[in-house]
Amino acid sequence: MVMMAWVANHAGAQKVSLAGKVFEHTLLRDGVNASVFQNPAMQSFHYQHSLNTLNLGYDYRHASTPKRLERGDGHKQAFVDVDAYLHKGKATLWGNAYYVNGSTRNVLYNETTDLEQLYPYLMADSVGGKTSQEYYYFMGGFSYPLGKKWTIGAEGEYTAKMEYRTRDPRPKNLTGDLRAKVGVSYLLGVLHSLGAAVTVRKYKQTNELKLYNEVSVPTIYHLTGLGNDYYRFRGVNTSTYYKGYGVGGMLTYSQKDQRGWFAQAEYEYTNIDKIISTLNELPMATLESDRFHGTVGYLMNDGHQYYGANLDGEIYRKFGTENIFGTAQDNIYPQIASAEFYTSAQSRIGMEAFYQSVYSNKSAWGGKWKLAYMGFSEKYQEPYRRLKHAAVMTSLLLDGKVKVGKCLLMANVHGGYEWAINKHNDDSFLSEDKSAMMRPLIHTNEYFAHDRWNMGADVEVPLLVACKFLPFVKLSWQYDYYLLTAHQNSLVVSLGIRF
């Protein structure tokens, strides 16, 4: 898909300057109504002009104390990223591909890839260590008009990950995540586009752990949430896998000129099983989740001034069902019952507003402000445990661009603050339970209980002037402060070319 866009883009004559295309593709408006273009049938009017970007760089992160112990306290990653958006005749094509190779330091209490997605059903130990990674991602889509009113679109994406360690304990995780999306839109009158889309997904992860040191063998835990684990299967059951599926749908509305009202509503359901291979494919647990997301907003522009706002909300819930087994015969455990022990809910509602002034594609300045309320709660039935957290978040971004000859200089500064809202938790179990797997829970609970803030900047500088190519170097930096004294620095340096 990316190669098709590159060839076709250079086969046709360019009607606007390259700098003008970059101005359009980097408008602050783009993040405000981005959810509308999750429907592939709406992508035909996302941008007026084609633009491709090739980017390679280095990503570095280091924390004095990690935000979550399971994510490690820093990483070093090299990456290559290719992005394309192309109008070709009546069709619109887009694609993205990237490759990441690196390592994460001091990963603790987690030996499973895709932590956020599969939590709480992780495989863990108390040793951990440096974990190496390779990530691959491919996405491509198209939209095409059927007559004057109807437009169809489709998009597919695939993510593959490999994570491993060369010293005990040695995880070797392989994941495959395949998603497909089909959409349709109908033009009401001249400008009003109403659309719908359906999504399907297939997921699998092989999660295996090797232990070669027979003298010192750590206990392997199969976590079930809030510091609990499936006690019966503790020990050396180190081969597991996850498999599952997802389905969803969305409704979208927008004007083709991206003025006036826009809206999007989406629902997604996911079902993933955890299976312990070393116990004759024992189905330990099932994790179900559903996500509701909605956005409504208003945009205006006169070609020189762009402004607008949105109201955005999301609810993400998880339901964990554990299977109960009888006495094993020949290492086969008969399933005798199942029960829903774990539930969690994340909620967010917020608003976003922006203003940007563009002067004939020669310079631009603007800002974006966000305000949101975020809540999180999780509960385990037996033993009964419950934690709640909430925060109010605000952030501000100031953005500027200036054209120098045929090149473009871009920069922004941004910062944010989160006020923790104390909840009346019965968290006495955090100090009473002395098991090894309580430490990451205590750490995460402390993180959410305190205020945190961040600040950063992005600068992009062109290297030379060319007619059809715009090479650039980009520097991104962010500083995070949390847990009263902990801090984290993130730095990304990249070299790229737009064409």
Language-model regions: role of each:
Residues 10-105:
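N-terminal, post-signal peptide beta-strand-biased segments of exported outer-membrane/organellar beta-barrel
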Residues 64-71, 106-112, 164-171, 207-213, ...:
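Outer-membrane beta-barrel translocator domains and adjoining extracellular loop/strand segments
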Residues 228-367:
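Long, internal scaffold/assembly segments composed of regular secondary structure
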